[in-house]
């Protein structure tokens, strides 16, 4: 069962640049491997990641088969107000996972 680990600072000062780290537990099967009997192992990857802050999109990434299992993404953003980060992963076979984290700006 997929699960997300999120690292967002609990507090920051107005205008600070903060680092956000995400790790999603997922097999990321490329669809290029074959079984011992020669059948193709079906592709099963996360295809997109989106981060929103207080409803506004601040980061988006499209993911492809070359991404390793359990994709780790890190990015930076500037915070000017307290609020809530919302993270969304979408993938093959109807995969969808969400997580959230809040930050207080002083």
Model-derived segments and their meaning:
Residues 5-10, 14-63, 68:
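Contiguous segments within soluble domain cores/interaction surfaces
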Residues 102-106:
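Short beta-strand edge segments in extracellular beta-sheet folds
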Residues 1-2:
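Proline/serine/threonine-rich low-complexity linkers at boundaries of modular beta-sandwich domains
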Residues 91-99:
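Short acidic/polar inter-strand loop motif in beta-rich domains
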Residues 83-91:
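Short, aromatic- and glycine-rich surface loops/edge beta-strands on solvent-exposed regions
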């Amino acid at each position: 069962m997929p699960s997300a680990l999120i690292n967002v600072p609990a507090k920051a000062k107005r205008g600070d640049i903060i680092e956000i780290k995400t790790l999603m537990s997922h097999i990321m099967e490329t669809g290029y491997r074959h079984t011992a009997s020669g059948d193709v192992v079906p592709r099963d990857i996360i295809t997109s990641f989106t981060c929103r802050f207080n409803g506004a999109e601040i980061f988006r990434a499209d993911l492809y088969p070359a991404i390793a299992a359990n994709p780790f993404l890190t990015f930076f953003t500037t915070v000017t107000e307290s609020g809530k980060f919302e993270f969304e992963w979408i993938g093959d076979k109807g995969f969808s996972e969400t997580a959230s984290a809040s930050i207080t700006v002083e």
